[in-house]
């Protein structure tokens, strides 16, 4: 996970598990301020928890395995009383995932990589509605290497979260949402990106993307992006190639209004090698 430049008074956690196919989550809450603070925790299933007297610089762990939850997948909102906090979530099972909590949402988050039915990999996108009203969200999928453009629509209640992508490409489930609709093809290999293109109540949203390959216990997690934060220059702190069998790749989404010329990216990549 990435470090923090600052905390926030409210933190949103879109993806939490309790015994979800063997996965449980836990998260650390750190006081980044200069005064003692209390933290109230509200889960999307209606349960609550709290932290009292969290001192400056101190952190405390909250484990979902020790809490009472009916659903296996849910979300949380943390509210600090007196100082900003930072939160990191760990998803623990046969594969280890991690992501950082969100301080704010945006109406149309972007997910640069969706990887479905690709050599055993599948992707689950958890989107949390951090607003005060229910909203119907449409996610549009755009292929880059493989697949067909399609859409998926679901209702997300205020404070709650819903799983996108997984149940329209990889795994069928019983749908009870009257607003649910999709043009995606179950079982299709899809490699591309996704974006929230409709949000009926214009609620702020946050999202976490999980990619998993069960057979070899491989996976990764990242947080969705606000298009307004897009830049013309991107810095990658770690790039690997043939490093004890590891290599890296990246997915880049054009969040602007104009198309990019073919080859524009490959002609403007600079690699810096470490000394020694």
Regions found by a protein language model. Give the residues of each.
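Gly/Pro-rich, tryptophan- and cysteine-flecked surface segments typical
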Residues: 1-276
